[in-house]
Amino acid sequence: MALLPRLAAGGLLLLLALAALEGKPAPSALSQLLEKRSEDQAAAGRIIDGGDTKQAARDPSPQRNVEPLCSCKDMSDKECLNFCHQDVIWRDTKQAARDPSPQRNVEPLCTCNDMTDEECLNFCHQDVIWRDTKQAARDPSPQRNVEPLCSCKDMTDKECLYFCHQDVIWRDTKQAARDPSPQRNVEPLCTCNDMTDEECLNFCHQDVIWRDTKQAARDPSPQRNVEPLCTCNDMTDEECLNFCHQDVIWRDTKQAARDPSPQRNVEPLCTCKDMTDKECLYFCHQGIIWRDTKQAARDPSPQRNVEPLCSCKDMSDKECLNFCHQDVIWRDTKQAARDPSPQRNVEPLCTCNDMTDEECLNFCHQDVIWRDTKQAARDPSPQRNVEPLCTCNDMTDEECLNFCHQDVIWRDTKQAARDPSPQRNVEPLCSCKDMTDKECLYFCHQDVIWRDTKQAARDPSPQRNVEPLCSCKDMSDKECLNFCHQDVIWRDTKQAARDPSPQRNVEPLCSCKDMTDKECLNFCHQDVIWKNADTSANPEFLG
């Protein structure tokens, strides 16, 4: 290290000698030393600060002569560094932090045994650590002369700190909280045994804890003189509180709820044994509990004089309620449902043994249950006079229904399907032993089942006069069908496939013993099988 100044001095003398020989004025010795020192500092800054990380860090740092408040055993401990070396490490974080730190002469409110305990640091060292967090926090803290409402045994208990030290810890959270707290003279509605029980605090201390949550809540609470509809044994039972204390707890939820509640003089349709049974409450107490849900629900309910289509043994059976009580329960769901229901005089196509069987209900009661699903379905159904193509043994077999009853069940699916079906006079290419075999149906009945899939398929099929390249023993073998019947099955897949196939006059590169060997087919018959899939495949490309 002692050699460096000597080398620097020797370099300076050499520069002076060279300048004298060339006849140029010699540079100032002071300027040369300053330049050398700035370069050394810049190099040191790059080593310490990571070099080019910040533009401002290239100037001589005012931090370099600052002593930390304390020392950290582990220099990778962010919390300790945050407290002890705040002037050093965090000094460059903000432009304003370059002025002398106001933190240095601040004493903490209390002391923490563990300097990495964020909750304790938040309370005791709030002025020190969090002081630079906000611009406004640079003024003398209003927290210093504030006494907490009560004391906490555990200073890391967030719920207790939230209640007792609310003015201290959360005081700086909002600008408005700097005025004298309106909470200090408020008495709770009741007392909680467990101060961390959020449900109890929500009910009893609502004016105290939640008072600052909304601007409007600063006025005298309208809850204080409200009596609940009934009493709950368990004050943490949300369903019971929702029903009995609705005016008390949920009263401040909406602005409109501040007017006298229209629920108070409403009698339920029926009674529920279990007040936590949501389905029963939905049906019997709909006018009471769900009455405030929508603005329109404040008018007299149109449900009150409606008789259900049938009766359900189990009032919590959603499927049965959906069918029998549709006018009652789902009546308020849509605005249009307030008119007399068109379902009432409709007879089902057939009868279902199991009223929860969605497939059967979809087919037999389509006009009844699904009638209100779409606006267009209110006209007389075109399904009623349509005979199926064939009959299914299992009415829940979707594949069979898709083929045989296509005109009946799927007829209303698309607007275009209301015209006479072009399928009715079409003969299949071949027959399938298993009507649920999708591959066979795809090949033999392609014109029948898939004919309605695309608009273009309504023209005469170009497949009908095409002979396959070869024959497959197994008509469900997709690989064989892909090769032999490519022109037939895949012909309709793309618009371009309607032109004469370029495959027909193409000879394979080689032969495969096993026509289901995908690797061999991929190499030898690439021009045949993949020719239509990718136009870039050609003999030149294959070499």
From Swiss-Prot:
Residues of the propeptide: 24-69, 92-109, 132-149, 172-189, 212-229, 252-269, 292-309, 332-349, 372-389, 412-429, 452-469, 492-509, 532-543
Subcellular location: Secreted
UniProt repeat feature Sequence, residue ranges: 51-90, 91-130, 131-170, 171-210, 211-250, 251-290, 291-330, 331-370, 371-410, 411-450, 451-490, 491-530
Cystine crosslinks: 70-84, 72-80, 110-124, 112-120, 150-164, 152-160, 190-204, 192-200, 230-244, 232-240, 270-284, 272-280, 310-324, 312-320, 350-364, 352-360, 390-404, 392-400, 430-444, 432-440, 470-484, 472-480, 510-524, 512-520
Protein origin, superkingdom: Eukaryota
Annotated stretches, region: 12 X 40 AA tandem repeats: 51-530
GO BP terms in the entry: intracellular calcium ion homeostasis; regulation of systemic arterial blood pressure by endothelin; regulation of vasoconstriction; vein smooth muscle contraction
Residues of the site described as Endothelin-receptor binding site: 90, 130, 170, 210, 250, 290, 330, 370, 410, 450, 490, 530
Primary localization class, coarse: secreted
InterPro entries per record: Endothelin (IPR020475), Endothelin_toxin_CS (IPR019764), Endothln-like_toxin (IPR001928)
Tissue/organ expression: Expressed by the venom gland.
Region annotated Disordered, chain positions: 45-65
Family, similarity comment: Belongs to the endothelin/sarafotoxin family.
Protein task: Vasoconstrictor activity. These toxins cause cardiac arrest probably as a result of coronary vasospasm.
Name of this protein: Sarafotoxin
